[in-house]
Each structure stands twice: as structure tokens, then as C-alpha cells.
Amino acid sequence: MLGSGFKAERLRVNLRLVINRLKLLEKKKTELAQKARKEIADYLAAGKDERARIRVEHIIREDYLVEAMEILELYCDLLLARFGLIQSMKELDSGLAESVSTLIWAAPRLQSEVAELKIVADQLCAKYSKEYGKLCRTNQIGTVNDRLMHKLSVEAPPKILVERYLIEIAKNYNVPYEPDSVVMAEAPPGVETDLIDVGFTDDVKKGGPGRGGSGGFTAPVGGPDGTVPMPMPMPMPSANTPFSYPLPKGPSDFNGLPMGTYQAFPNIHPPQIPATPPSYESVDDINADKNISSAQIVGPGPKPEASAKLPSRPADNYDNFVLPELPSVPDTLPTASAGASTSASEDIDFDDLSRRFEELKKKT
């Protein structure tokens, strides 16, 4: 089945180009659809309901095309993520069968929008044979995505979907609109009439995969009334039962003792701890012991020779300290010595007297 014209690097490059081209087209078509909705609101305000219905069919067709491009973008991304399988395996991997067949089926229908998609389909046919490509284009192989085939079909959208689009557009732009009662009466029971169906209603009701086909998110399966059952709460541990590790269940060891047990030593006893703490002497008891004679004291006393050699220290009594008496200041002048002149005895040097008086005070 290995084709002769397959080039792995060319397939890789064109897959990336297809992804970029699809993103640009999705953004462009979404913006154009938003502008077209304003035009439809103007038709409804002017009372041109039939004209508005025709324009809504164009918008639905563009929305379908955008959703189909999103599916193809996801498939191209999947092939790039698993490109190693494409290179290493000669046969087609079962996880890539839907992606490969869907890209080959969509290539002739979208090659006018995305030219690189045809190159991708040709490389896949060269890898897995032209016969496989023919089976994919006619969906005889049965692995083409059903949602993508529905989005790219040429059938007209259902009337109930057109009415829902008109109701939603009128509500967004505050335009009065009365939906067709005959069409609304044909709506299937159990489906909300004000919900816009963009192709995901059946998938959600069936609990199938989300946007992007296989590998998407799977919705939880609900009950017959559409409700989703609540999960069972986790069991909470009892507050009264303490946690403990289970004992190991292994062979006996260590002289027949099972694992996880402890045996005390038979000849070793723990020390006895007294019930009350020991008593200590108080300060009063210490002072009372000072009056006990030295004969009652147990133990060697100090040697008398050592105590005799100790110098006696005078008692420090600063309160009874008495200063020595100072001599009184003389009131009379000293007598003049013999041979001194009368003028000398009359001249008294008071500075000399003060100096000598200060010296006497210092000596005493």
C-alpha cells in the first residue's frame, strides 16, 4: 500500500498552511455573518419577513461552513501531532483513519476555499494508495465524519431552524417579530423553541463527542428526563476511631515473633520514679545552722595556722568617722626678733601669712 510519490515534508508543510488558511477564513466569515444579521434585523423592522428568511438561510449555510472548517482544522492538527506514525508505519493507523478519510472526502468540496487542502489529500492518497482515496471520496469506507458531511451537504436548512434564527436576531436588535405559528407547531417536543440549533443539539442529547469529532469531550449521560445524576459522595472517616496502620502479613521471623511486635528485656527493670520531688533546705534553715558549733559540723575544718596568717581587716564604719581637729588661726602678730628694724616690724606681709596658713591646713 506504500505509494511512490509520497513526500513527508511536503505533507507536513501543507498541513500547517491549511490550518492557517482555515483560521483566517473562519474569522472572515464570522465577521461577515455578524454584519448580515444587522441587515436581517432591518428587513424584519421593515416588515419584509420573506426576504429576511432567505437571508437567514445564507447565514445558516455560512455558519455550517465555519463549523466544518473547525472540524478540518482539528483533524489537521491531529495529523501533525501524530506525524511520527504516518512516517514510520506503512499501514494506516486505526486512530488516524477518521482524520485521513475526512480530509480526503472534504478536499474536492473545499479546494476553491483552501487550495492547500487538495495537496494534503493527494499526499495522503500517495501514502495509502489511490484506491483508498477513491473509497474515501465516495464514503464507501464508512469512516468519514458524519457531522462534517451534514455541515457540507447541499440540503436546505430546516424551517424550524430558520425561525429560531429570526427570533434570536429580533431579540438581539429589539425588533418586533411574530414567528410562523405553523412552523413552530411542528417543533419536536422537549426542545426549547428559543434555542438556536447550530448542529450540536443532537450530539449533546446523545452524550456524544464535542466539536471536532473523535477525541473530543464526552458529555455525561443523563437520566430519562435529561438530568445528570450527582456523583456519589466520598466516605468520610469516623471521628471516634483512631487511625492506625495495618500489621504486616508476612512470615514469622526473629525467634518466632511476628513482625510488628515488641518484647521487653526480662532482666532489666526501669528505675523507680519517686511520687513526690525531694525536699530542699530553705533560707531559714541555712541561717539557723550558723548557730551550730563547729564541733557538730561533720567534715574537716579550716587549719588554725592558715586562719592565723590571714590579715585582720578593719571594720568599715564610715558613719562614725571623725575628722582631726585643725589648729586655730593666731589672733596676735608674732614678736619682732632682736636686731630687726622698726620699719620691718611695722610692715606685715598678708600674702605670706595666707600662704603659710594654707600650708598648715594641708599638713594637718
Curated annotation (Swiss-Prot):
InterPro entries for this protein: Ist1, IST1-like
Interaction with VTA1, as annotated region: 190-364
TM regions (residue ranges): none
Motif MIT-interacting motif: positions: 351-361
Disordered: region residues: 294-352
Subcellular location: Cytoplasmic vesicle; Cytoplasm, Cytoskeleton, Microtubule organizing center, Centrosome; Midbody; Nucleus envelope
GO molecular-function terms, A-Z: cadherin binding; identical protein binding; MIT domain binding; protein domain specific binding; protein-containing complex binding
Motif (Type-2 MIT-interacting motif): 321-332
Alphabetical keyword list: Cell cycle, Cell division, Cytoplasm, Cytoplasmic vesicle, Cytoskeleton, Nucleus, Phosphoprotein
Ranges where the record places region Interaction with VPS37B: 64-279
The name this protein goes by in its record: IST1 homolog
UniProt organism field: Homo sapiens (Human)
Origin organism lineage: Eukaryota, Metazoa, Chordata, Craniata, Vertebrata
Gene: IST1
